[in-house]
Structure formats: structure tokens, C-alpha cells
Design a protein with these regions (language model features):
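C-terminal capping region of solenoid repeat domains
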Residues: 97-105, 109, 117-118, 142-143, ...
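Alpha-helical scaffolds that organize eukaryotic protein assemblies
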Residues: 148-152, 157, 161, 167-168, ...
Length: 359
């Protein structure tokens, strides 16, 4: 029997999906080890310290993930070794205290610059909690012309300078700026006046407390925005900004959680103008009342509504909305309300949509 060529072996490898099986075979077949490395498209790195030892086996990776400690030198290695990477996922759940001093001062800006320069096919980049600053973001946008998703959540060094660069992106669809608390209305204006306004479908600016009504009014220029998260943007957001957001006709998903100066005025505007809206989260909006909730009785597309910690919304308002709506499928309420709503009423509501309770 003739020895299998690399092409034939590559076809066989594509049929072996279990990672344990792949690892077992690679331990007894050097050719398999080599070819499997060349055909691997995705890798998740648990210990970046040994990255230099094994990464050269995988020159054709298109997706790279590392949620643990990583430094600029590691990213430079990735950029040099794997130029075909399209998806870079460095999201982490916490900041690491044991960074090198140079990395602690600059975040991963140097490494991200190397990635942006070396991996020109980047489409999706996730950098949550990685301390990226303006230099890293500008590098990504200068080199990454195909970028569609960018997660900068909790990168609290980001300022309006980064948003100016993002505004020039021509293919960006998803942008997460959660808790980037240095950004202001000026940054949102640059986003709304740039090329991004014609492509962005999902924008998260939750916990950005320097945003005001003026910044939200700029978002009206985003012609295809479908998802908007404004949770905990602070008291500077009022009904003026809420009404402006309501005028975005493409909105399908809207989170207004804990905007304490949003009232029924905003809800009435949303019910009237946001005809494509399917999900609305009003958690902690203390000023809204049953009048605002009842405005959605005739809304034709609303499917999910969250009314947690809405102290001025009562049983009769919820019942009227659910029984009158033709589209509502899910409603979430405070658990404290449960004792005040008769069992018969709860059962009646549950006939038309799923009733969920939170503590």
C-alpha cells in the first residue's frame, strides 16, 4: 500500500471532528501531526507562555482565542506566524494583575498594532477588558478595512479620538463600547457623521455616563441601526434623547434600563414611531407608568417587554397590555408583584404570553 500524500491525509483529517481522537493519532503519526497543524483553522490558547513553542504548527489559522493572561510579545508572535487570522477573540472576564509593567501602562496597544499590520483579513475583533487605548483602535481601523465586529467593552482608556477613527470604517456592523466612560457626545457625533452610520446595526454604549440627549439625537442619522443598548447611561439622558432614539425607524431591540429620567413621553414616542421594535427593556425606569405601557397595546411587532423595578406599573396595566396585544410573547415582572396579581389573572396572562418573574 502506497503512503498517503498530504492532500489525501488532509481530506481524512476533515472527517475527524473529535479533538481527543485527533490528539491521539498525532501522537503516533508525525505526518498527521504536521498536516493536522496545517489544516487547523481555529485554536483556543489556555497558556500563552508556551505560545512560541506550538503556534508555528498552525500557520493557516483563521480564528484565534485567548481569554487568559497575554502580552504584547505574544500578540506579535501571532501576527508573524498566522497572517490569515480573521477572528481575534481576546475577551476576558477580569483584568489581570500580573501584567508586565510595560503592558500595564500601554495595555495591549503594541500587540494589537502588530496584529492589525500583520493580519490584514481581520473581520471580528473582541478585546473586552483588555485595556486597549486609542492607539490600538486607530491601528485596527487603519489596517483592518474588512472589520465587521469590534468589542471594546470596559476598555476605559478609549476616548472620542478612537470613535473618530471608528467613524471612518466602511463595513462595521457591531460595536460594543460598554463602560468606555471617557467617550462623550462628540464621539457619538463623529460615529453618526461617518461611514459607520451607513453600516452599523448594533451599538452598545451602556454605562457611558458622559452621554447626554445631544449625543443620542445624533444617532438618528444611523440609517440601519437595529440594536441599541443605553442601559445605565446616567441622569443626563432624558425624554429629549428618548424621543430622538424613538425616531430611528430600523430599531428592533432597545435597552433603556435604569435611565431614571425616561418617562411615558419616551414610551409613547417609541410605540408610535418604532414600528419594527421587537424587544424593549425598561428595567429600573422609575418614572414610567401604566399610561406609557398601555401605549403598546396596538403595537404590531413588540414580542418581549421587561418591566422589572418599574414601581408605577400595576397589575391592571400589564393585563390590559397582554390581552390587547397581538404580538407580545414574553413579559418579565418583579417577583414582588406576584402576590398582588390574582392566580386567575396570572393564568389568563400566561395563555397569551410567557410570564417571567425576577427577584
Amino acid at each position: 500500500m502506497e503512503k498517503l500524500g498530504d492532500d489525501e491525509l488532509g481530506l481524512i483529517i476533515n472527517w475527524v471532528h473529535d479533538h481527543n481522537d485527533r490528539r491521539s493519532i498525532s501522537q503516533v503519526c508525525k505526518q498527521w501531526l504536521r498536516v493536522e497543524g496545517q489544516t487547523r483553522l481555529y485554536i483556543r490558547v489556555l497558556e500563552a507562555e508556551v505560545l512560541h513553542n506550538f503556534l508555528p504548527r498552525f500557520p493557516n489559522l483563521v480564528a484565534f482565542q485567548a481569554s487568559g493572561l497575554i502580552c504584547n510579545a505574544h500578540l506579535e508572535c501571532v501576527a508573524q506566524t498566522c497572517p490569515k487570522i480573521e477572528v481575534l477573540n481576546l475577551n476576558t472576564r477580569k483584568m489581570h494583575d500580573d501584567l508586565d509593567e510595560s503592558d500595564e501602562l500601554s495595555g495591549l496597544n503594541g500587540g494589537i498594532h502588530a496584529i492589525a499590520n500583520g493580519c490584514r483579513e481581520l473581520r471580528k475583533v473582541y478585546l473586552r477588558r483588555r485595556g486597549i487605548g486609542n492607539f490600538g483602535v486607530v491601528s485596527l481601523l487603519n489596517f483592518g478595512k474588512n472589520l465587521t465586529e469590534l468589542d471594546l467593552g470596559r476598555c476605559n482608556r478609549i476616548t472620542d479620538q478612537a470613535l473618530e477613527a471608528i467613524g471612518y470604517a466602511t463595513s462595521l456592523c457591531v460595536l460594543n463600547l460598554r463602560c468606555c466612560w471617557l467617550i462623550t457626545d462628540s464621539g457619538l457625533a463623529m460615529l453618526a457623521n461617518g461611514s459607520t452610520a451607513r453600516t452599523l446595526k448594533k451599538l452598545i454604549i451602556a454605562e457611558c455616563e458622559r452621554i447626554t440627549d445631544y449625543g443620542l439625537s445624533c444617532l438618528q442619522q444611523m440609517c440601519c441601526l437595529e440594536e441599541l443598548n443605553l442601559a445605565e447611561c446616567g441622569p443626563a439622558v432624558t425624554d429629549i434623547g428618548g424621543v430622538a432614539v424613538a425616531s430611528i425607524p430600523t430599531l428592533k431591540w432597545l435597552n433603556l434600563s435604569w435611565l431614571i429620567n425616561i418617562s411615558d413621553v419616551t414610551l409613547t414616542a417609541i410605540a408610535e414611531h418604532s414600528q419594527k421594535l421587537t424587544v424593549l427593556d425598561l428595567t429600573g425606569c422609575e418614572l414610567i407608568t401604566g399610561e406609557g405601557v398601555r401605549a403598546f397595546v396596538d403595537h404590531e411587532s413588540l414580542e418581549e417587554l421587561v418591566l422589572v423595578s418599574c414601581v408605577n406599573v400595576f397589575q391592571s396595566d400589564v393585563e390590559l397590555l397582554v390581552l390587547g396585544s397581538q404580538s407580545l410573547k414574553y413579559i418579565k415582572l418583579d417577583k414582588r408583584l406576584r402576590m398582588w396579581i390574582p392566580i386567575a389573572t396570572q393564568e389568563n396572562i400566561s395563555r397569551f404570553c410567557r410570564l417571567d418573574w425576577t427577584s
